[in-house]
Amino acid sequence: MSIVIYTYHNPYSLKENQELWNEIVNCPYFCVSQTLVNGLKTLYGKDFQIGRVTTVKNLTDAVYKYWTGTACAVKQHTDIDNIISTASERCGLNANKVENIRKSFLFNRDEVFNSIRTMFELRMDPHNIVEKYLTPEQKFIVFIFNEIINSTKNKDFVLKEDFTEQEIDEAVISALQIAKDNSSNASEKVVISEFDHIVIHGVHQFSPLMLRTIEEVAKYKKVILLFNYQEQYKNIYQTWIDIYSSFDCKMIDFKGNEFHPTDSSTISYEGNMLAQNMGKLLEGRKEDITVEKPYEIIEFDNMTEFAGYVAKIFEEAERRDPEHPMSAMNEQIYAADSSANDILKIYFPEQFGERQFLNYPLGHFFIAVANMWDSETNGILISDINDIRECLSAGILVETSPGRLASTFGKMESLFVGCLSVDDMLSRIKKVRKNKKFISDDKRLEYVSHISYYAVTKDEINELEQALNDLEELASFFYEDFEKRPNNFKAFYKKLKQYLQEEILDERDLGDEFIDIINRVLTRLDEVENIDASASFECLKSTMSLYLVQETKPGKSANWIVRNYEQIDGDVLRTAKDSKSQIMHFACLTDEDIDAVKTREFSWPLNADFFEVAQNPVDWKYQVFVKARKEYKNFKRYALIYGLEFNKGKYKLSYVKRDGDLEREPYYLLKILGIEKKRNIDRIINRKLADVSDIQIKDSSLGTYSMYDYYRYRICKKRFLFETLTEGNTVYKDEFLLAKYLEIWVENEIKESMQGLPGSELVLVERINEKYDELKKYFPF
């Protein structure tokens, strides 16, 4: 095995160490992330061409193409699902425990799937797992693992081994070619003069598949593992040494000058000094620390306020450069907790990658139909009326004009409260039609005109009725008797592909962009349509995000507005080119966000004890993987100091004070060094707000308004908009308001019919019950 580890000291001075530079400049080069690829290209230009340099993920995907493909994932899901569904007490647990664990495993299908794949990727031997140290859930997953190994399903989980040299060469070339094809410089000639070794740069979190790739490539080529190391900050960089020591191979440190900030006139000096002081603090050299003034840190009260701050920066950049807003941001934000993206995704969806097929109305249609289908009754079972709304809004079912079905359903939605099937809905529609037909009293017609589902036309009712029948028929076409058919996945994929091709692409007037997306979904379906697999309907539904997704289009990947700390190592190199205008903003600086690992180290139900107590293999890949997972808690601290140390521009620090009811303080190292909190709200409180108090409706048609219209306008302008300008009537749609309306209707008719008559409580109660029984037919829900 030919693996060697190199360390360097200064990322800006790789060229200065000629021996190291000569080894890495002409060979295939694989970085931990695309940001590191971009940073090296920005800093070193043509020496790091895209096409010679790409990501490690591209390499692993090329070496294990089938294993990382959709067909393999779907087949493995079906195998695992079938074993879970048929598990019994022979797994070593009592019947009650087996049933409970089966349910939890089926609910957490994706986690279980990832855990099983990890076990195969690490070549675990079930005989080396000590059962007495396992939890019941871990015993169950080991049982599944054993069942796969000892059955014909094993062939679906075999990773290719014993590659030939030609196959490895082809995989490396393929990975580089994919990167070149997806870049803007696809026509540039790329020269790789040395093919006998490769470089893998900056990896801290090694996956089992990455380690298998390194092992296979190292059989024929020298593999250089490269990372930055600062001897002056041994405690900070110990996390890297601990991981790379597990490779049990030669480690060579290419000496160079350690970085020390000396020029106080540079704009990056204060941030560089902060990194140095944090490093000295962690090295126990507190007496060497000098802090001229407290470091400023911005305080955001909550994550929403932080997201609002980021949104303003992004909007300004978007105005300057609508085509490339991310590069136009003068403040790049890196957060130890990047959940602000969940908020920003709502306001700037186009930034987070191409919209997936399942996020389009057509995709919502397939999700909604699958949610409603009940394989036990072999029909639609409505547990959430919103699924019906999604189906009617998708544009799949026939309607006179786009959106009319959704509009009709909106008027009639309260009628369907409590409906569990399409037949229930059709039955209530039938009652409404019958009631409308037999109302002859003008006064009663006036009363029902205020009930939303009586305010629909005959044509609208007929159209909705037909759509519901078509929906049931379409659901049956896809899913009827699904679990009774052999190779049911294969049959379903063929039907789905046929429907998308013949009923959607050929029959519908679609935009070019959506046609392109559907064609790429069909390409994905080509991968899986010949899978000989049978599993439960729930398994089919849970894998929908694997097969109903378009193939990735070059240039359409996500551009996260708030980046995580894994992106710092590459982006910091880009500050060397534009140091005056760039600000690196390090956010979410609390102990909870820096030191704590919010994501689990291992996928459920595996944990540290499973890897470290229940077994003790000596394989280096196993040791590296487990050590890397355990060391992730130290990575963010390293990344923060690395970013501050090598940043050539300005910097900002911030933290989010509240996480739910929990109040947090800034990161402890910053507090020790001395910080001054600046509340973000205080920075913006005096900002002048635009006057929006006098919003006018322009070019609106004038009409004659009744006394009731003026009354509505004075009480509630929103009701005036809906009832006078839009609907022309007061119509009640809400279940609560309709119940209240029935109460008032009964009261009014009783008062009118008993006016002037002697009354008694007994007679009154009797008349109320009679009137209620007479009128409740108008409220079938």
Where are these regions (language model features)?
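Helicase P-loop NTPase motor core
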Residues: 1-28, 33, 253-350, 371, ...
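Accessory C-terminal helicase-associated subdomains
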Residues: 431-573, 741-781
